[in-house]
């Protein structure tokens, strides 16, 4: 259909609609005139009185409206002052003898035709609804015609929405990526291959076709991929896994073909697929079966990666934090040959990351990046960047010219615990919370296996009314049973302090999160870590998450008697730890009372001040922070609170 003919059709439809609207306006004027006549006669008369007037000969003229249901009469009577007036009368339906009576009395009467407004709206709706549908279809047809006939519009919809950075310099190099030195060394040979491929080809080596980066969010997977392209000086083509599949069937596979076609045109280059688990999940499993469109896209990715010509100079890098759900064919040699894990940085890595992000920040001379790195275990690179940014924002809000440790500490507290709330004014609740937090801090300080106290505060943050911060002396990949038990005892210190000081009837709900944490930790000690009398066995090794393509439900592979024994061991461990916490609170009651008074007065006590006050009353134990120190400990002392 040509565009000019469509315009003519729309013009004719518009003229028809104008005609209908014009007729509707005329009809409305007639109805309004009729209503005006009705409203002009304020005198009303009953039908019985009307018949009496008719018998008396006082009716001069009658006008019928609304299909004979309403009559406007002209009458003159002594009641009306012998003046001719118009009166409204409602006529009963089906009173045909009235016409005979009017003719007998020789009264002039006229029936006026009226227009039913409801009928008009019904007719208009019958006309407008089909017209609206027709106009909508014409509009959609024109859009589809333009889409099909436009230059390259249909083909562009099937093209991959990848970002192609063809400049040799990506503005990101390995120096901008800190905290993952081992991973950077792993990619040095990838960069060397892209720069000097003949070194590998001369000895018959084949560079891996694909490398998949595995790690938690914010650890620098995308940044590392850009740095590889920047170091190698090759184009960088990036796309997200969610951009392949859309509402139309076959679009995902088409975009995959277009992506690799673009890569071949820009070879040597790097293709980066972020969040590949969006299209790379295991096929045909899980609840509801597979997703045909997603699986078709995955099959095309497998075909393209396996169909490369040898040594074309195209390296595919993918990133995911859910490698457990990826299809096995995607991870086999010849596709993603290597899996590189990018873990959360250790204290040395965090320090290097802080140095990178602090380059454009104005820091005070007394600020310590090493202390910040020590206070932020578990922070990713993105978290550390956000930390310094929040510190800078807080510095500007306070009208300062440089970031100090005060802003950094406040930003850490905000990121970990939430916004700062209003301090408590209720003396009883404030004292109860103070005993709860001091209970955590005192036990954590007096246990040699426990981490050191960093800060105790009564300032609310988030959902917490009070907080006790602990900071590890170092980061270990291996945690001893003594450390786990010390954590359980310290976590139960708040509840133990409440019971010892206020009695069992005054314990509160403040320990609900503590109880949840120690229950989960204790159950892991029994079922996963083999740290109980159940024995050195793992009872949940085969448990997998549901709905991710592996299974539909979790099955316990042990008997009911073993389950009962697990529950008994969990109860025994927790009870033993709670008794230890209660004993420590009772033995140091005077010290705890003094610390509570100080905390209520100052609201916040730093770790150094806290340990100094405790040292005035009792000798502090030497913290055991390394395996060599732990190996020199008297085993009998260790056994006193580790074995159950």
From Swiss-Prot:
Cofactor binding: number and manner: Binds 1 zinc ion per subunit.
Single GO molecular function: ATP-dependent peptidase activity
Residues reported to bind Zn(2+): 436, 440, 514
Coarse class of the protein's main subcellular location: plastid
Membrane topology according to the record: Multi-pass membrane protein
Lumenal side: 27-119
Keywords, sorted A to Z: ATP-binding, Chloroplast, Hydrolase, Membrane, Metal-binding, Metalloprotease, Nucleotide-binding, Plastid, Protease, Thylakoid, Transmembrane, Transmembrane helix, Zinc
Binding site for ATP: 215-222
Record topological domains on the Stromal side: 1-5, 141-644
Compartments, record wording: Plastid, Chloroplast thylakoid membrane
Origin: domain of life: Eukaryota
NCBIfam families for this protein: FtsH_fam
Name under which the protein is recorded: ATP-dependent zinc metalloprotease FtsH
Gene, per the UniProt record: ftsH
């Amino acid at each position: 259909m040509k565009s000019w003919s469509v315009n003519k059709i729309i013009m004719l439809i518009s003229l028809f609609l104008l005609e209908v609207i014009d007729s509707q306006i005329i009809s409305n004027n007639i109805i309004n005139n009729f209503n005006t006549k009705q409203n002009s006669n304020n005198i009303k008369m009953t039908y019985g009185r009307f018949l009496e007037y008719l018998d008396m000969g006082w009716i001069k003229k009658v006008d019928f409206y609304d299909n004979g249901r309403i009559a406007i009469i002209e009458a003159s009577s002594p009641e009306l002052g012998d003046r001719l007036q118009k009166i409204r009368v409602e006529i009963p339906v089906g009173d045909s003898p009235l016409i005979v009576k009017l003719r007998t009395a020789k009264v002039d009467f006229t029936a006026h035709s009226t227009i039913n407004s409801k009928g008009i709206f019904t007719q208009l709706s019958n006309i407008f609804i089909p017209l609206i549908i027709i106009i909508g279809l014409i509009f959609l047809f024109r859009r589809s015609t333009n889409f099909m006939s436009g230059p390259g519009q249909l083909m562009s919809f099937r093209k991959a929405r990848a970002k192609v950075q063809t400049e040799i310099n990506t503005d990101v190099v390995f120096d901008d990526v800190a905290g993952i030195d081992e991973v950077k060394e792993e990619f040095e040979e990838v960069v060397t291959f892209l720069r000097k491929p003949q070194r590998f080809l001369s000895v018959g080596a084949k560079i891996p076709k694909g490398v998949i980066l595995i790690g938690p969010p914010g650890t620098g997977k995308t940044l590392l991929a850009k740095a590889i392209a920047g170091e190698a000086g090759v184009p960088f083509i990036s796309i997200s896994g969610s951009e392949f599949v859309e509402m139309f069937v076959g679009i995902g596979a088409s975009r995959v073909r277009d992506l690799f076609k673009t890569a071949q045109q820009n070879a040597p280059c790097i293709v980066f697929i972020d969040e590949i688990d969006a299209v790379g999940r295991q096929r045909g499993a899980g609840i509801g079966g597979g997703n045909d469109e997603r699986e078709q896209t995955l099959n095309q990715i497998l075909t393209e990666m396996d169909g490369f010509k040898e040594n074309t100079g195209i390296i595919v890098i993918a990133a995911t934090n859910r490698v457990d759900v990826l299809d096995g064919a995607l991870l086999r040699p010849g596709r993603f040959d290597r899996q590189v894990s990018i873990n959360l940085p250790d204290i040395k890595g965090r320090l290097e990351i802080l140095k990178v992000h602090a380059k454009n920040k104005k820091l005070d001379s007394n600020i310590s990046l090493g202390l910040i790195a020590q206070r932020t275990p578990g922070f990713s690179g993105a978290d550390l960047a956000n930390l310094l940014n929040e510190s800078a924002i807080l510095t500007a809000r306070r009208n300062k010219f440089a970031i100090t440790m005060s802003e950094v500490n406040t930003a850490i507290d905000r990121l970990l615990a939430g916004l700062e709330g209003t301090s408590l004014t209720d003396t009883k609740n404030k004292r109860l919370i103070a005993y709860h937090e001091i209970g955590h801090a005192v036990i954590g300080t007096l246990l040699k296996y426990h981490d050191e106290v960093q800060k105790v505060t009564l300032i609310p943050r988030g959902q917490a009314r009070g907080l006790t911060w602990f900071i590890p002396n170092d980061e270990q990949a291996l945690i001893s049973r003594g450390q786990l038990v010390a954590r359980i005892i310290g976590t139960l210190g708040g509840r133990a302090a409440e019971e010892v000081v206020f009695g069992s009837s005054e314990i509160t709900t403040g320990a609900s999160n503590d109880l949840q944490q120690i229950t989960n930790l204790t159950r892991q000690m029994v079922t996963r870590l083999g740290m109980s009398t159940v024995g050195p066995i793992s009872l949940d090794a085969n448990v997998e998450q549901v709905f991710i393509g592996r299974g539909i439900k979790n099955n316990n592979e042990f008997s009911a008697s073993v389950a009962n024994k697990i529950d008994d061991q969990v109860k025994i461990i927790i009870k033993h730890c709670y008794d230890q916490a209660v004993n420590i609170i009772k033995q140091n009651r005077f010290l705890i009372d003094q610390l509570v008074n100080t905390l209520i007065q100052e609201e916040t006590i730093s770790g150094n001040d806290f340990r100094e006050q405790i040292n005035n009353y009792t000798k502090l134990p030497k913290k055991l922070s390394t395996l060599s120190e732990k190996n020199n400990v008297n085993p009998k002392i260790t056994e006193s609170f580790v074995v159950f």
